[in-house]
């Protein structure tokens, strides 16, 4: 079973028919069928915002997914200090969540086979170094 880390943008698109990437997210959904899905906690903080939780259908589907036996939620505390430093570093235009994801992708103690994102430019380098499949538009 492949381990896939999935970025917040994918989940927004997957659950929102009006999102510009919705059709692509549905297409990428096949990757999730037989995968171990990795949820960094920061992506859950982004996804489960006020607007999202108002949709009981989307919230219910996300709850099932998060609680599924093939899902792993990853605590970010190990990465937070370094990610904060990177975020405030001059010339780094990546969000705190993206920096945490980058550090997780770079962590060889985590088995990550692929990353699903619609923001490939922020992750392509670390994915290439670690030989992680980048599933992106």
Task: Write out the residue ranges for each language-model feature.
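Acidic, PIN/NYN-like endoribonuclease modules and their adjacent C-terminal/linker elements
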Residues: 1-3, 102-103, 107-137
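PIN/NYN-family metal-dependent endoribonuclease catalytic core
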Residues: 6, 24-54, 74-75
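Metal-dependent nucleic-acid phosphoesterase active-site entry motif
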Residues: 1-21
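Alpha-helix capping/helix-boundary segments
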Residues: 10, 43, 79, 100-101, ...
């Amino acid at each position: 079973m492949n381990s896939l880390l999935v970025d917040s943008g994918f989940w927004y698109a997957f659950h929102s028919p009006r999102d510009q990437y919705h059709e692509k997210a549905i297409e990428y959904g096949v990757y999730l069928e037989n995968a171990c899905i990795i949820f960094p906690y920061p992506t859950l903080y982004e996804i489960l915002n006020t607007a999202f939780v108002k949709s009981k259908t989307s919230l219910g589907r996300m709850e099932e997914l998060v609680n599924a036996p093939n899902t792993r939620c990853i605590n970010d505390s190990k990465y937070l200090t370094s990610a904060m430093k990177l975020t405030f570093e001059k010339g780094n235009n990546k969000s705190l969540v993206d920096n945490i994801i980058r550090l997780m992708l770079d962590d060889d103690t985590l088995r990550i086979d692929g990353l699903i994102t619609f923001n490939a430019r922020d992750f392509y380098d670390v994915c290439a170094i670690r030989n992680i499949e980048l599933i992106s538009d």
